[in-house]
């Protein structure tokens, strides 16, 4: 198995509050291009992510959308039970729909949230059960993903663990490429 951990900014950190936001189109375009490249090179066959609103769910949605053309499995992992319990109905529905579409879902803890160690254990689980990572993240603009980024960097000191980053410059390039491709198709 060749497993990719996808994580990154939460939706609110990117100012994406709707599935119709044009930024989301560009983000999914960039994620899709990256995943296609790895799949075509035979570097991954699993996309594993968390359930956070934002990059994690978008990464899984993108991988699921590629399953008709590529042999890729998806897994949604959470750091504790009842992960979405405090979310509004709309976000809980998105989470529920995603759990029904992925190939595998589980929690790294057998309990609802109790203490921060559950988050650290989740992070360790993801590092030990994946072979590489993709972060939608820019170290110049830290957010909650900073903790995963730092954990991966530390893990790389003792393990061969490739880390790829889609940063804001990459997203700008993806936006320009997307616009150019759609302009060509329009005319």
From Swiss-Prot:
It holds the Pfam family YpsA. Disulfide bonds: none annotated. InterPro entries: YspA (IPR010697). PANTHER family: UPF0398 PROTEIN SPR0331 (PTHR38440:SF1), UPF0398 PROTEIN YPSA (PTHR38440). NCBIfam families: PRK13660.1. Belongs to the UPF0398 family. This is UPF0398 protein LJ_1195.
